[in-house]
Swiss-Prot record:
Protein name, per record: ATP-dependent DNA helicase Pif1
Reaction it catalyzes: Couples ATP hydrolysis with the unwinding of duplex DNA at the replication fork by translocating in the 5'-3' direction. This creates two antiparallel DNA single strands (ssDNA). The leading ssDNA polymer is the template for DNA polymerase III holoenzyme which synthesizes a continuous strand; ATP + H2O = ADP + phosphate + H(+)
Gene: pif1
InterPro entries noted in UniProt: AAA+_ATPase, DNA_helicase_dom, DNA_helicase_pif1-like_DEAD, P-loop_NTPase, PIF1_helicase
Family, as annotated: Belongs to the helicase family. PIF1 subfamily.
Species name: Campylobacter jejuni subsp. jejuni serotype O:2 (strain ATCC 700819 / NCTC 11168)
Cofactor: Mg(2+)
Subunit structure: Monomer.
Length: 447
């Protein structure tokens, strides 16, 4: 399928969209491999450190030298700095050699940030193509301050002037890869767009459980909820019930480049889906937080800690996965990187690194940290749903409706409450209605 996408990218910039679990990330990674095999220069950028890691790239803030700026005014001040000017000179040289820029999780990129990216590319006279990947029906950009901007009507990247300039060819994927249950997938597809009828409501209400049923569920279920405090409390409570000794692993942080400020490094570490202090016990249920196909685990897969092994200077965690496979887990190193021009190619400079076991306790996780995961046995606590797309993201982590449960303490009518927390931004609905999408899997023009 990536060969079709590759042909389109020869002539057009592309927006690749589609619901949760349709294979957007897989297709993107296959495209990157294809470009690199052909010795074409393609750079993969993530909206966060985690999304950058998932596609083997760097963050767009790092690549485009945006610092902590969230609007053009702040960027213009930053660009007066002499060190910044040196970075921008290198960026211009690098952009001359790149044939494709990929930006993942575009829904998390604000209109202001996308406009700043446009400013960088226009100043560098970039002649390559741009592929943006994501689903605006999922989690929106994180806006720290709801201040006056050029794009007050919408904070999404598609509201920026630069988005219009790119004249994207809109493409979508529509066939489920996460679940094989088509009824479940079709219901999810409709609530993704904010559509809810009696049939859909009845389907999800049939999955509801009460507190007693929640307490009686086996520990191999993961509870998703909207607030960190509840997640931490549940995980600590479950861990405390295990009678085995507590073991703490602290992340090993190395700053390779003295130019990196401590607050910048801390912010990068926080954006990764790992813990600075990992507290575990033998017998604890864990969830993997990254994809590492070479080592036989993926983001969202679960297992139980069988043992902790100390061999000479190395430490391994023996984990029995839910499928029965046993693996010896090693610490994983994440790198904070920047790209630099080197002749006709580019080199990767390591600015900092953090090494930690890429797991968390699996009894509970937040909805925001679950994005991109596929979870087999899932309980969605819908008491604290407050963000656009959050309910859809939570429910669509499930791989099988037979092992999906919905929990709420609300005393009001379930249907009324469910409809009330099904929050979809009207700008997103209007955007998808207004644009035609070519379905890459059935090759028909969809309105």
């Amino acid at each position: 399928m990536f060969d079709k996408l590759e042909k389109i990218l020869a002539y057009d910039n592309v927006f690749l969209s589609g619901g949760a679990g349709v294979g957007k990330s897989f297709l993107t990674n296959e495209l990157i491999k294809s470009y690199r095999k052909q010795k074409k220069l393609a750079i993969a950028l993530g909206s966060s450190a985690l999304s950058a890691f998932n596609i083997g790239g760097v963050t767009l803030h790092s690549f485009f030298c945006l610092g902590y700026c969230d609007d053009m005014m702040k960027l213009s001040v930053l660009d007066r700095n002499q060190k910044q000017k040196e970075k921008l000179t290198k960026l211009k040289e690098l952009l001359k050699t790149i044939e494709l820029i990929i930006i993942d999780e575009i829904s998390m990129v604000s209109a202001n940030v996308f406009e700043m990216i446009g400013f960088r590319l226009k100043n560098s006279q970039f002649n390559g193509k741009i592929l943006v990947v994501g689903d605006f029906f999922q989690l929106p950009p994180v806006i720290k301050e709801k201040k006056e901007t050029l794009f007050n009507h919408s904070y999404y990247a598609f509201s920026s002037f630069f988005w219009q300039d790119l004249n994207f060819k809109n493409i979508k994927l529509s066939q489920p890869k996460r679940t094989q249950n088509m009824e479940f997938y079709n219901h999810l597809s409709l609530i993704r767009q904010g559509f809810l009828d009696e049939k859909i409501l009845s389907f999800f209400e049939s999955l509801r459980i009460d507190y007693k049923e929640l307490e009686n569920l086996e520990d191999d279920y993961t509870l998703l909820c909207g607030i960190n405090k509840k997640v931490n409390n549940i995980n600590q409570e479950k861990l405390s019930k295990l009678e085995t000794p507590l073991v703490c692993f602290k992340a090993q942080v190395k700053k390779e480049d003295k130019r990196i400020k401590d607050e910048e490094l801390d912010s990068w570490i926080r954006s990764l889906n790992i813990l600075e202090e990992l507290n575990i016990k033998i017998g604890a249920r864990i969830i993997f937080c990254v994809n590492n196909w070479d080592k036989n685990y993926y983001n969202g897969e679960q297992g139980i800690i069988e043992d902790i092994l100390y061999e000479e200077e190395k430490i391994y965690i023996s984990i029995i996965k839910n499928n029965g496979m046993k693996i010896l887990l090693e610490p994983y190193t994440f790198f904070m990187e920047e790209l630099e021009q080197s002749g006709k190619d580019f080199v990767v400079n390591i600015l900092a690194s953090v090494t930690q076991f890429p797991i968390k306790l699996a009894y509970a996780i937040t909805i925001h940290k679950s994005q991109g995961m596929s979870i087999e046995k899932l309980v969605c606590d819908i008491d604290h749903i407050f963000e656009n797309g959050q309910l859809y993201v939570a429910l669509s982590r499930a791989t099988n409706p037979n092992t999906l449960k919905i929990y709420s303490t609300k005393k009001i009518n379930f249907g009324f409450y469910f409809a009330n927390i099904l929050k979809i931004d009207s700008n997103v609905i209007e955007f998808y209605k207004k644009h035609n999408f070519l379905d890459l899997e059935i090759q028909e023009q969809i309105i």
